[in-house]
Amino acid sequence: MDIPLICNDSALSQKAKILRKKWGFLSTQSDHFQLHLLPEYLALEQKDDPKQGLVFVDFVSGSVAHRRKFGGGKGQAIAKAIGLKPGVQVDVIDATAGLGRDAFVLASLGCNVTMIERSAVAAALLEDGLERAYLNLEIGTWMKQRMRLHFGSASEYLQHHQTGVVYLDPMFPHKKKSALVKKEMRVFQGVVGEDLDADSLLEAALNAARYRVVVKRPDYAPFLNDKKPTMSIKTKKNRFDVYVKQAMPQNKS
């Protein structure tokens, strides 16, 4: 999908040119999806449905910051699924990074997270969010140490990189009338689409992970690739299917 990047601020015009060249974005207007380079952030808009609002990556404030401060720490479901233990620093590849929220939670809990994203739109939004977060006095230092982004195919990356844990959260068709599907996710999914190769990605993840693979699924979704997990950790909306290969180490992974 060809996505234009619109910039109406002359002070940002050079940056807009750099981003268009780097990511292959267009400079013409669109009747459907388009990116906006604003002084505050890079944002995605569904132009034919403006009520959906702008989608951007924010690791500093809003719901992500609230989750970091009050989300339950290592007692929350995602931490249990990853297998976090006191004194153990886990290397994680988030092979379906999306808007980076789960990756951020894991990094805030001490994991070293490499986010993989093959969508140029998603990767550009993530990079913009990371750059702003790196400058933040409260979280910037550990963000630089623990969160990084790789743009490209997750399957290819996993063929050449081993890690402690691989985390997968592939796009899955939501129930049409589900109130759980947030507006911004509807916009985001409209651009990146479904992960039709998610089943094969599980096998690549199992080959790359030393300790386990964690797959986040809607509570109504079948197991990825119809492969039964070692265990599942359920939440109100989702579940984490955990495929254990071997026990976590008692010290640094």
From Swiss-Prot:
Q: Is Metal-binding there in the keyword field? A: no
Q: Name one Pfam family in it.
A: SAM_MT
Domain of life from the UniProt record? Bacteria
Which GO cellular component terms, listed alphabetically, does the Swiss-Prot or TrEMBL entry include? cytoplasm
Cellular compartment(s): Cytoplasm
Single GO molecular-function term? rRNA (guanine-N2-)-methyltransferase activity
Q: What class of enzyme is it?
A: transferase
Predominantly, its location class is cytoplasm
**Entry keyword set:** Cytoplasm, Methyltransferase, rRNA processing, S-adenosyl-L-methionine, Transferase
Q: Which SUPFAM superfamilies match?
A: S-adenosyl-L-methionine-dependent methyltransferases (SSF53335)
Where on this chain does S-adenosyl-L-methionine bind? R101, D102, E117, R118, D169
Write out the catalysed reaction: guanosine(1516) in 16S rRNA + S-adenosyl-L-methionine = N(2)-methylguanosine(1516) in 16S rRNA + S-adenosyl-L-homocysteine + H(+)
Stated EC number for the protein is 2.1.1.242
S-adenosyl-L-methionine keyword on record: yes
Write out the similarity annotation.
Belongs to the methyltransferase superfamily. RsmJ family.
Its biological purpose: Specifically methylates the guanosine in position 1516 of 16S rRNA.
The cross-references to HAMAP family, in alphabetical order and at most eight, read:
16SrRNA_methyltr_J (MF_01523)
Protein name in the entry: Ribosomal RNA small subunit methyltransferase J
State the species of origin: Psychromonas ingrahamii (strain DSM 17664 / CCUG 51855 / 37)
